[in-house]
Amino acid sequence: MIQQESRLKVADNTGAREILCIRVLGGSGRRYAGIGDVIIATVKDALPGAGVKKGDVVKAVVVRTAKERRRPDGSYIKFDENAAVLIKDGGDPRGTRIFGPVGRELREKKFMRIISLAPEVL
């Protein structure tokens, strides 16, 4: 469950290491984002010489949350950390690699490019 001011680890090779959520997209009163939801964030920590710099405002899709999520079959999924992947306006990832597992909910939200790059889909 991600909300404004939540900090997330970046799970791709764009050069950003940590981002801070500044807006959850999807309605004026939307408060929380889960796996597969798009957020607007600012880069808080980045590698030198990377494609993104500290202070850049970016779009990202949440791929892991520490808060458990109930699935339609009754099972629950949760991860050890909150993580996101930076995306372009079209929804394609900005990086060329994705690190760590991602949630199956991304498939339902049509983020197929992220699913294909991920090493594991849980």
Swiss-Prot record:
Classification via Gene3D superfamilies: Ribosomal protein L14
Family matches, as SMART domains: Ribosomal_L14
Keyword Acyltransferase tagged: no
Keywords: Ribonucleoprotein, Ribosomal protein, RNA-binding, rRNA-binding
Molecular-function GO term, any one: structural constituent of ribosome
InterPro entries listed in its UniProt record: Ribosomal_uL14 (IPR000218), Ribosomal_uL14_bac-type (IPR005745), Ribosomal_uL14_CS (IPR019972), Ribosomal_uL14_sf (IPR036853)
Any one cellular-component term (Gene Ontology): cytosolic large ribosomal subunit
Gene Ontology process terms (BP): translation
Presence of keyword DNA-binding: no
Function text: Binds to 23S rRNA. Forms part of two intersubunit bridges in the 70S ribosome.
Classification via PANTHER family: 50S/60S RIBOSOMAL PROTEIN L14/L23 (PTHR11761), LARGE RIBOSOMAL SUBUNIT PROTEIN UL14M (PTHR11761:SF3)
Similarity section: Belongs to the universal ribosomal protein uL14 family.
Subunit structure: Part of the 50S ribosomal subunit. Forms a cluster with proteins L3 and L19. In the 70S ribosome, L14 and L19 interact and together make contacts with the 16S rRNA in bridges B5 and B8.
Protein name: Large ribosomal subunit protein uL14
Organism: Acidothermus cellulolyticus (strain ATCC 43068 / DSM 8971 / 11B)
